[in-house]
Amino acid sequence: MCIRDSCQCGRSRKHSIEELRKKIYDIIWEEQLQRGVAAEISQALMEEVYTTPKPGLVDREDTGAHTDMDCQTFQKSTEAIAEDLAAMFEAGYSWEADPETLFPLLRERGKKTEEKMFAATGGVNTHQGIIFTIGILAAAAGISLRNYGKIESESVCRISLEMTKKELEQDLRKLKQSSGITHGEKIYCHLGEKGVRGLAMTGYPILCELTVPHMKQYIANNRDKNQINVQILLEIIAELTDTNVISRTSEKEMRWLQTEAKAILKAGGAFSENGLQKVRELNQICIRKNMSPGGAADLLAATIFLCRMETLMERRKGILQ
């Protein structure tokens, strides 16, 4: 608790019982923190997968537009990467320098995490986008907890911007001089859509301004958890320029999917039987078109993660009071 010898402190009764109690809880909390974060990440990733129905995506009813993965594939992948993503939170929590100096280290760790994912899934890309997005958000959450003693989506998104903006802007400048390697990079070179890089370097406004506030409101209104997740997914699809959809189909088809999501929301969304039936009908169309809004699914998982982290902090506050 202080730099003095513990025996001297004990004899002098320098620290109150309440101070000692709080310090003990802090030590226990820090020891359990990474395990707790890993559990929250696992829950967020699998909660997204099990959300049903979803258009073109793997869920409990079918595998959407995918023939190489199912719920079990995602379970294996989640088990392989959750601890690594939690370690990125720990890296942020222990980082003392500027956030932007942490990002190159996160990217290197992310490559190793991708290798674990591919090893677990037999080469299937289940969570590449998640590793990038949750890795950044987890590290930013760690920095937020260290610097401000709390985790709130607004501060996490702001720190994400501070952490990534400079390096990702450099990435995009270099990409302009090439034809791109990944699907997302090729789309940026041809269409100028920045994809996951653009979301990170602008501080994930869709999360902190739209999906997290909406999810918290739906939870406060005691809505069904699965329906909340379907609703949030529809809201994301309606707003996001999803490069996953573009890479599998075209920009025109992605705009069509946005329009369909908006129409379902207008018809009552996931909180109506009619809306859920329309999602199932849209799923069948997406399967025929080989269309999968994977970028939107990643942001649903990110939304769940941020809400769960805020709840985790509330539980911590309750323990310390």
Predicted segments with their positions:
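Phosphate-rich cofactor/ligand-interacting catalytic cores and adjacent structured alpha/beta frameworks
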Residues: 7, 17-107, 141-284, 288, ...
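Active-site cofactor/substrate anionic-group-binding motifs, chiefly glycine-
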Residues: 101-102, 106-121, 125
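Conserved small/polar residues in nucleotide/adenosyl-binding loops
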Residues: 1-6
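Conserved phosphate/anionic-ligand binding catalytic regions in large, soluble enzymes, centered on
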Residues: 121-138, 290-305
